[in-house]
């Protein structure tokens, strides 16, 4: 299978313009560094000065699994901040992932949403003062269920 893919990739790049080939190399560089959505990677390549056509060619031919990219991006987000299930989906959609990609990533990320509520509550308490009910309301606004919000607040001593 790898040989077939290599032959197909070679056939694609044989007909590509220099700009398309350069955009494809840059797309691979970016994907080796971090996760992108389909539209996010096109936007990044355009920011780098590639035309829309070159960027689209590169993204169409880079071989990325966009579901896998969404899962990687979800893991990246959860490594530095806390999210509710719906909040994570919303953030991934904001980054350009489809609803299906974002939902699957949230479903498969392995997050304990109660623990995410604990972490998010702590993030808020590190920067501001809240009453118990005020923090529960804030967590619910962030997309946590009532049960998750109450758990998060309780675990933080409120």
Named regions from a protein language model:
Residues 5-158:
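An alpha-helical, amphipathic repeat domain used for nucleic-acid recognition
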């Amino acid at each position: 299978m790898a040989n077939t893919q290599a032959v197909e990739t070679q056939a694609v790049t044989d007909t590509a313009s220099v700009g398309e080939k350069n955009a494809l190399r840059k797309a691979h560089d970016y994907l080796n560094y971090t996760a992108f959505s389909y539209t996010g990677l096109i936007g990044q390549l355009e920011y780098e000065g590639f035309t829309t056509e070159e960027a689209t060619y590169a993204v169409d031919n880079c071989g990325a699994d966009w579901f896998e990219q969404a899962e990687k991006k979800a893991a990246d987000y959860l490594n530095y901040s806390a999210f509710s299930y719906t909040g994570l989906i919303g953030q991934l959609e904001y980054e350009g992932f489809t609803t299906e990609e974002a939902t699957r990533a949230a479903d498969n990320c392995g997050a304990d949403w109660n623990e995410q509520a604990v972490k998010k509550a702590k993030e808020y308490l590190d920067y501001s003062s809240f009453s118990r009910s005020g923090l529960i309301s804030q967590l619910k606004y962030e997309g946590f269920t009532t049960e998750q919000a109450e758990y998060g607040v309780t675990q933080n001593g409120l």
